[in-house]
Amino acid sequence: MAEAYQIQSNGDPQSKPLLELYVKASGIDARRIGADLFCQEFWMELYALYEIGVARVEVKTVNVNSEAFKKNFLGAQPPIMIEEEKELTYTDNREIEGRIFHLAKEFNVPLFEKDPSAEKRIENLYRNFKLFLRAKVEFDKGKKEPSRVEDLPAQIKVHYNRVCEQLSNIDQLLSERKSRYLLGNSMTEYDCELMPRLHHIRIIGLSLLGFDIPHNFTHLWAYILTAYRTAAFIESCPADQDIIHHYKEQMNLFTNQRETLQSPTKTHTIPEKVLSDIRVKGLAPDVNVH
């Protein structure tokens, strides 16, 4: 039923709670991680607790269509978290977030620092992207190649403009703060929310929309590069093929067999020109061009 990704414990394992996170499996291969954003978000938060020795963590992929899963979890959908020691199963996102929050607070882990400015910049980014995605996919139906943004009708271009405006605002915030993460030099809940969504926007933009995050948003790209060098993100990130398959299923788009047979790959590099600009600004001087 489940493929386990065990994060080894630091120190005395018996003194720390064991948290089992069940995440949705890939629609291509049930042994691989699926592209559910909330699953990755909670995985990253739990990884942050593991890294400093607060908790033991096991992550298991589950095929939500299997009879074993339906029987064991009675219709609940991933993410699901189990804390066996307390005989508790958390099936609601707010319950999972609440348990992680209390653990972080108990051990003084600054994972849930509140920042209205950062919150305002990132809220609705993904919603606006989904509106753009749905509108453009519908417009491009029957076309061999995605249409160019400049050729889109005004009612679709408005969604594109909103996405770019929000990306620009995040780029500006990062420029002002001069920090690796949104709130400073440590990852917080805002990064666990934003990093996976930016990655999905990038992968789906390039594969389905003929769209890329504007290359002049240098501080935003430096932030994306930080994601690609953050263990919590790397461990929890699905393959490109699984992200694309996830959205094609949502959009009812045809997936040919060749795509499902491809070896899984993960895009964790950025364009050379962008990387060069990042170096010039001294944002990541130790990174080599790929």
Swiss-Prot record:
GO terms for molecular function: chloride channel activity. InterPro entries: CLIC_N, Glutathione-S-Trfase_C_sf. The lineage of its organism: Eukaryota, Metazoa, Ecdysozoa, Nematoda, Chromadorea. Monomer. Belongs to the chloride channel CLIC family. The chain crosses the membrane at residues 37-57. The gene is exc-4. May insert into membranes and form chloride ion channels. Involved in the formation of the excretory canal. Required to prevent cystic lumenal expansions in the excretory cell. Not required for formation of the initial tube, but is required for regulating the size of the tube lumen as it grows. This is Chloride intracellular channel exc-4. It comes from Caenorhabditis elegans. Pfam families: CLIC-like_N (PF22441). GO terms for biological process: chloride transport; epithelial cell development; regulation of tube size. It is a single-pass membrane protein.
